[in-house]
């Protein structure tokens, strides 16, 4: 043990780091010293609430998956239950083949079960190919190896055609991962589909992508019917915070009561001299200070986490440091008028549409608490893995691109009263083929090193609930090691 109070250093003041700090405080008590270090000058990481003249808006993640009851329960345990709000229920749309169309309901993250509802969004030939894919007399069954992982875009294109990738799968996944489907692995991004393909193979059924998608949809429908039959209230698809995610990260800081070291990074982690096997680490900060820590939780981006593990866990260092990152930008615009803005929650943009934006969220339509303020709030999203050209544009250029695309899609051409441009450099990890296996190898290596854990959006999922779960697991690991 280090001299003085039990000390845990948390590298990263984003959601993962703050939740880990909160869990550590609950487990270790008020006497523990918890030090949260972050090179940024603010807490929250990729969650960022900014103030406008009409109230707070989000320029990072906007919402979380409402069916993740564990996340909602956690927020309520923090005393934030009254802050949670639900969307309006207005439909979302997709722009493809030159038109804005209703979002199809018979797909699994864009992978269709049939051509129903896809006419116009896709060509007649592609619709016919979708309907033939599950018929062994027209299309050879899919060769699937149980437990295997494949490139999502390549799989969908090989079975259903390029249009399905560009008009459905890439737009739906682009907002989550800032990647085209061609840059993602199936098992990490659409796990239910991969598991269903495994199940079909295990019992010797003819395997097809559309049949697997239909089975996933059927399972979801059955689960929903069971919930309704039990009297349970159906969970909204999304939830967010009335006053922004700032409510969450400020509350976590207040209740975890860590020492905040903002504007300073962690440069190196090494086993403390004379502390072999004890788990005690020397944590060198970017300003030259060295903190003696009984445990360390790494809640930083993958390249940073990988570099910091170099001396204490080389195997995990190499794996985690190899996770690629995608950059993106959000252009949040507040308008004094809503006249002419369509009555839906937003538009996803097909990958081959020829526009700069990949999506628009009509936040004031989607969220009643924002609509109550009057005027309109619209968020444009830009940037994909492997292409930072749009993210590198100036604020004025990005704003002009957002306004031009918004006008092209909707005809809405009001002058924004306020604009906030937020760039997320390397903000979203890429979930490539084999990502899950690599993370299991990294976890196994880290499990052999006492009093250190790593978590974050690069690990088990980029969404808010996934980061919550990951942070809790990381905190529990070091607490168990300290016991």
Describe each PLM feature range.
Residues 16, 42, 303:
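Conserved Rossmann-like nucleotide-cofactor binding loop
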Residues 104-112, 360-483:
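Conserved flavin/dinucleotide-binding core of flavoenzymes
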Residues 134-268:
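Active-site/ligand-binding neighborhood in enzyme catalytic cores
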Residues 265-378, 383-392, 396, 408-409, ...:
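Mid-domain catalytic core of redox enzymes
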Residues 73-105, 160-165, 255-262, 267-280:
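Feature captures the FAD/FMN-dependent oxidoreductase FAD-binding
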Residues 25-51:
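Glycine-rich FAD pyrophosphate-binding loop
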Residues 53-144:
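Dinucleotide-binding Rossmann-like beta1-alpha1 core, especially the glycine-rich loop
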Residues 2-16:
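Beta1/beta-strand and adjacent pyrophosphate-binding region of the FAD-binding site
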């Amino acid at each position: 043990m280090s001299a003085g109070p039990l000390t845990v250093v948390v590298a990263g003041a984003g959601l993962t780091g703050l939740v880990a700090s909160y869990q550590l405080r609950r487990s270790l008590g008020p006497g523990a010293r918890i030090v949260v270090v972050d090179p940024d000058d603010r807490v929250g990481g990729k969650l960022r609430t900014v103030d406008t003249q009409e109230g707070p808006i989000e320029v990072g993640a906007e919402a979380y998956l409402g069916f993740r009851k564990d996340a909602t329960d956690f927020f309520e345990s923090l005393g934030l239950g009254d802050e949670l709000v639900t969307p309006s229920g207005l439909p979302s749309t997709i722009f493809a083949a030159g038109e804005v169309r209703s979002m199809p309901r018979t797909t699994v993250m864009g992978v269709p079960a049939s051509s129903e509802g896809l006419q116009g969004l896709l060509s007649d030939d592609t619709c016919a190919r979708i309907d033939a894919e599950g018929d062994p007399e027209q299309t050879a069954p899919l060769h699937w190896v149980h437990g295997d992982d494949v490139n999502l875009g390549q799989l969908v294109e090989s079975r259903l055609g390029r249009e399905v990738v560009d008009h459905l799968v890439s737009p739906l996944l682009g907002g989550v991962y800032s990647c085209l489907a061609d840059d993602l692995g199936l098992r990490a991004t659409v796990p239910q589909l991969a598991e269903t393909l495994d199940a079909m193979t295990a019992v010797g059924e003819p395997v097809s992508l559309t049949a697997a998608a239909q089975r996933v949809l059927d399972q979801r429908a059955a689960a929903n019917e069971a919930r309704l039959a039990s009297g349970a209230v159906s969970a909204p698809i999304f939830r967010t915070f009335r006053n922004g995610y700032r409510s969450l990260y400020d509350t976590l800081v207040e209740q975890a009561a860590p020492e905040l070291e903002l504007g300073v990074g962690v440069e190196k982690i090494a086993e403390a001299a004379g502390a072999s096997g004890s788990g005690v680490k020397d944590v060198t900060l970017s300003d030259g200070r060295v903190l003696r820590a009984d445990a360390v939780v790494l809640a930083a981006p993958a390249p940073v986490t990988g570099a910091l593990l170099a001396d204490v866990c080389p195997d995990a260092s190499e794996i985690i440091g190899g996770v690629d990152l995608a950059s993106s930008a959000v252009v949040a615009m507040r308008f004094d008028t809503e006249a002419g803005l369509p009555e839906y929650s937003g538009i996803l943009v097909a990958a081959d549409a020829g526009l700069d934006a990949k999506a628009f969220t009509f936040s004031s339509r989607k969220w009643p608490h924002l609509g109550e303020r009057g005027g309109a709030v619209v968020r444009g999203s830009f940037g994909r893995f492997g292409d930072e050209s749009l993210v590198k544009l100036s604020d004025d250029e990005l704003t002009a691109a957002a306004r031009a695309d918004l006008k092209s899609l909707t005809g809405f051409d009001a002058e924004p009263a306020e604009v906030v441009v937020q760039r997320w450099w390397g903000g979203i990890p890429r979930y490539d083929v084999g990502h899950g296996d690599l993370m299991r190898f990294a976890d196994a290596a880290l499990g052999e090193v006492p009093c250190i854990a790593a978590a974050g959006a690069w690990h088990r999922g980029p969404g808010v609930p996934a980061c919550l779960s990951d942070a809790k697991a990381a905190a529990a690991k070091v607490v168990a090691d300290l016991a």
